[in-house]
Amino acid sequence: VGLTTTQVGVLTTTQVAALNTSQMKGLTTTNVTALSAEQVAVLSSSQVGYMAAMGLNGLSGTQLSWLTTTQMAGLTSTQAGSLTTTTLAALSPEQLSVLGQAQLAALTSTQVASLAVTQLAGLSSTQLGNFSTTGLAALTEEQVDALTTTQISGFSAAQLRAMTVTAIAALDEEQTAALTSTQVGGLSTSQFASFSTTEIAALSTTQVRGLTVSEISGLSAEQVDAMTETQLSALTTTQMKGLAAADIAGMSLAQIAAFSSSQVAALSLGALTGMAQTQISALTSTQFSALTSLQVGMLNTDQVQALTTTQVAMMTTTQVKGLSSTALHEMNATQLGSLTTTQMAALTATQIAGLDSEQVNDLSAEQIAGLTATQVKSLTTTQWAALDVTQVQSFSETQVGAITTTQMRGLTETAVQALTGAQLGALSTQQVAALSTASLAGLTVTQFQSLAPTQVSALTNAQIAALSPDQLAAFTTADLSLFSKTQMGGLTAAQTEALST
């Protein structure tokens, strides 16, 4: 405007109030320093809004304190964004409290970071929500710590996410408790991971349900273990996928017990491997029965050995099929003994074949009798050798009929000698022909007498030649009539003599 500092200083309030747009914009830093309290007081909000950034920032702290809230409201967003940190520092909380959306959004990160906690305290939650994401990212730990719960609740999820991890970590328990489920769920993985164990434990079930899988998976085992039973029981089946093996391993039995059956079924295979033996054995019948066949299949040997007989007995056939052969091999006699005949019948041929001799010998007669034909065919010669007399005699005629010729050749003398007359009578001609000469030699006269003529006729020359005179004497005339000339010609003198007597 071409006025000197002296001339500006002697302007009347009427003259100051009459300054137009161009004149206000022309005020220099030197000009504005001459303005008195009376002159500043008559400036309209529009006139203040016309002042150039240079002129506005030329006002001293004392002069700035003269600006009314009405005048402050007249600042443009450009002016607000150009205020120096020194100028900002001179403004009172009341003056800042009238700034609108455009003005607050224009504040730079440097300006926001320079605000005193007392100045921030004067801003409403709505005003704080008007800060740009860049501005919010500049909030310091001290500034965030000073925010009220009302102010915190006014931030959008996106705005909170814009804050630094350090700033979020500065939130105290009372502040985090004020966050909505949307706000909590909108935090980044690293931001949520900055919560203390005390803050984690203080989250409401509503807040917990708002967490994302990424947020849960980003927690340390210590943080997860700080969650209460109520919080854990509030996790959705989707959220359960965020728990890792280390998280599960660190949980108390009370925490594990808090999970519902659907939550247990939702555990990832990796998380399930983290369960300790005490945790596995503590699973309730409802929880254990909820495990999928894939989950059961992932149980390691230590976990399988921890299963109680109650848990084993209540396994579904689908779960039983899910057990790995290695895991099944680690079951002790008590555990195996708790398997029902229905469960035994559900085992695959591979699972049956994976049992060792001691385990096979531990099976009850009822369990043996419950084996299917396919399972019987899967028994190895080593397993057959492990069977005792009671077990062998528990096989039904149908089961005996399922024995393969290869298995017949591998049957021990003890096993063959244990067969009842009914079982022997159920053998096919191919099975009879497959019996070893040593096995036949151990049959009693009574057993031989149970053989049908067709079975006798199936005996090979080598088998007949190995029979004792007493065994031959057990054959009826009808049986002997089925012998071929070759078979008869192969008889020893002792055998022939036994027949003649």
Model-derived regions: residue spans:
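General marker for long, soluble alpha-helical cores
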Residues: 1-501
